[in-house]
A protein has these predicted regions:
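Conserved secondary-structure micro-motifs at functional edges
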Residues: 1-133
Length: 133
């Protein structure tokens, strides 16, 4: 199956997010983050957005930057922000099975080869959010 995705980078690796779940991409000063109940949040005008740092989730050292790149993702009626190092753009990808070592791990939906020939893991948005409840 072909899946429209948004490619994002965390550390040296590229990951694919299903485009249907992407609401918007924000850039916010790192100093604008707040904390609620032990979790990072971003105060928006109309609501507070819970954040998941993809780099921390993956165990990758974050690139220190005064400006955060946040991909806002939809999960059911809720939204959350995924902090990434950079957004690489949209790409339609062919979904392939996960490598054996990653099967059954929460947060991964499949794998794909992207335009530059590298493998990118397709992230399961529900699995990423699952650790926040």
């Amino acid at each position: 199956a072909i899946l429209p995705t948004l490619l994002v980078q965390a550390g040296e690796d590229v990951y694919a997010l299903p485009l249907a779940r992407v609401m918007e991409v924000l850039h916010a000063p790192a100093t604008s983050l707040g904390w609620f109940d032990g979790r990072a949040v971003l105060d928006r005008k109309t609501h507070t957005l819970a954040l998941v740092d993809l780099r921390q989730w993956l165990g990758v050292t974050p690139t220190l930057s005064p400006l955060l790149t946040i991909v806002v993702l939809q999960v059911g009626e809720a939204r959350f922000g995924l902090v990434v190092d950079q957004v690489r753009g949209r790409e339609e990808v062919v979904i392939k099975p996960l490598p054996r070592a990653l099967r059954g791990l929460r947060g991964y939906a499949g794998a794909t080869l992207i335009g530059d020939g590298r493998m990118a893991l397709i992230l399961d948005v529900d699995g990423l959010r699952g650790g926040q409840d």
